[in-house]
Amino acid sequence: MKFSAYLWWLFLNLALVKGTSLLSNVTLAEDSFWEHFQAYTNTKHLNQEWITSEAVNNEGSKIYGAQWRLSQGRLQGSAWDKGIAVRTGNAAAMIGHLLETPINVSETDTLVVQYEIKLDNSLTCGGAFIKLMSGFMNVEALKHYAPDTEGVELVFGPDYCAPEINGVQFAINKVDKITHESKLRYLQEMPLSKLTDTSQSHLYTLIIDESAQSFQILIDGKTVMVREHIEDKKKVNFEPPITPPLMIPDVSVAKPHDWDDRIRIPDPEAVKLSDRDERDPLMIPHPDGTEPPEWNSSIPEYILDPNAQKPSWWKELEHGEWIPPMIKNPLCTAERGCGQQIPGLINNAKYKGPGELNEIINPNYMGEWHPPEIENPLYYEEQHPLRIENVISGVILEFWSGSPNMLISNIYVGKNVTEAQIIGNKTWLMRDRAFRGSDGPTERKFMNSRLGNLQTTFHNERESPNPFDRIIDRILEQPLKFVLTAAVVLLTTSVLCCVVFT
């Protein structure tokens, strides 16, 4: 048992070593951003680059009460298992970073946003949104960030709040060409978030193809939503809509007085029963209800308290005449009974209820009335609905922290799908395989982007020229075979040694 445990420990450590070496082999474009959090030694060092907001509300309390820390994750020593963790649950969380090289997305570019999330505790309500910001020039802008801060160009990430919400949010900022008002437009249809899964980490990817005006959402490298030709507003629903409606109702027109929109009406030929009196009550006093012999209705049930004293602070000029409180009349005992005696009620035999007539379908029904439509004076045609109109200068994580110790890592923002694929393959996929201890066809494949027909996967990447890396690759491809082979070799060696030395 100890021997097999040792072999499995050796396999995991080989995976960690391989993952560490893979990170150093990734080369990105100059305007690509990848935060794997390897450069930070502790939380204090992290806070020099990743800034939390110090904004306060009207009461003087900090808006974002959640605290962050640098976390190593589950596999200690793993270079690709490091990230930042929200230490506080049930609090507003925010942390941001300024990009050294701002990202300018042109009409022909492809924008990719990708990051990894791992929950350690169960979640009932919370999110994990990433926001791309424009106009952030210095650290002070991050320190003063508030929910109403302008410059949010894009929102992406999982959101869960049982039972109403469970999906991946996507919103893009667009400026109305008529009113010049800037608003985030939220996608109304959302794929399931998988945010409640605490068993493993999940990788969230957004790919926007500016030239095709299409977008794709992936979870763990698998496409969960693809929407093409966003300029066709009938296919994709954003709220508020990216393109205003061409026709709108004419609010100046009122419904005609003779418009009959009643679906059913009382039958005009039905005859109401002549013996029906709608004034008859449902219940009547019992006809045999008489006072018991010992009952005395002349004695009041309640009297003024003769022993009550007017309070010393009572002033009749201010409070009016003082009246003692009422008490139960001591002369009215349970045996005798006093006051007005109310007889019991019984059902009225004459009651027949209101005379409801039968209904028929209205022969004059004209349907539901709608005002006529007119051309929208604020209409304009949006040629590039998914265009990021401003230069991206900062990345912010902002959400309601519903789960303490939630780990976020491997944040990528760039214009290259292949870069995101390689990062996902060399980080999330490597760790996922180590956790699962398997390497089937499903685990090997990562992304298959319909936007560009790229099919780069972990399996078909070029092999490393390093012999040590190639040996580890073979071990990782078939870990069970490696464990069994090593066990047989060690057992055979032990037997031979015993034979030789005896």
From Swiss-Prot:
Disulfide bonds join 125-161, 332-338. One of its GO terms (cellular component) is endoplasmic reticulum. Gene3D superfamilies: 2.60.120.200, Calreticulin/calnexin, P domain (2.10.250.10). It is a single-pass type I membrane protein. It comes from the Eukaryota. Residues 1-19 form the signal peptide. Interacts with newly synthesized monoglucosylated glycoproteins in the endoplasmic reticulum. It may act in assisting protein assembly and/or in the retention within the ER of unassembled protein subunits. It seems to play a major role in the quality control apparatus of the ER by the retention of incorrectly folded proteins. This is Calnexin homolog. It comes from Saccharomyces cerevisiae (strain ATCC 204508 / S288c) (Baker's yeast).
